[in-house]
Amino acid sequence: MIQGDLVQIQELNNEIGRFLIEIARKAIKEEFKLDKLDLSNYNNPILDKKGLAFVTLEKITYNTSSLRGCIGYVEAVAPLKQIVASAAKAAAFSDPRFNPLQKDELSEIIIEVTVLTKPEEIKVKDRWDLPKIIKVGEDGLIVEKGILHSGLLLPQVPMEYCWDEETFLAETCIKASLEPDCWLDNSVRIKRFHGIIFRETRPDGSDIIVVKPSDIKCKLNELLNNF
């Protein structure tokens, strides 16, 4: 094993997932001077490999959850443990969609870490074939046009919102600040990737689960079942 190689999601297990969640929570708590994160304490060789990851924060209020921040990296610029620590801080304090996380919210925050495979461009002769090629519940998508437009949606997102493949493509275009049908434009690059999700079951990191994107339940269906 060569230190610095890209982490493969097949290498990851519950123990690694627990470390990643712990790193993310400690990184956030450190900003409030409630904990100290020393990455040298995490000397597992897999964590020292370069990695791609996103950290998602959800705020739990009674029986509902809402997004509180999500930031990540799709370039292998640092070891996985460092990527997760940086993404956690950014999700908590630098996501432009939200105000910075407050100390009194920590007890309501569920942390989710998604480790990604390297994105690969999808090349097709006929752009209308794209919805037949991508797989909801398996693929995450990146849409890029030039240097000004880029949007990414994680594999779990279309499952949560009950999207089909064409809607998934359109929503990723919108995320890139492009028209919903941008995926039909040959100058637009479409990339896909896979991911494995580690998630806290409650806001303290004491218990985590491993989630496949295909296992994510549609939030719309859950809402309908409550009526």
UniProtKB/Swiss-Prot annotation:
Transmembrane segments: none annotated. Residues 15-209 form the AMMECR1 domain. This is Protein LS215_2104. It comes from Saccharolobus islandicus (strain L.S.2.15 / Lassen #1).
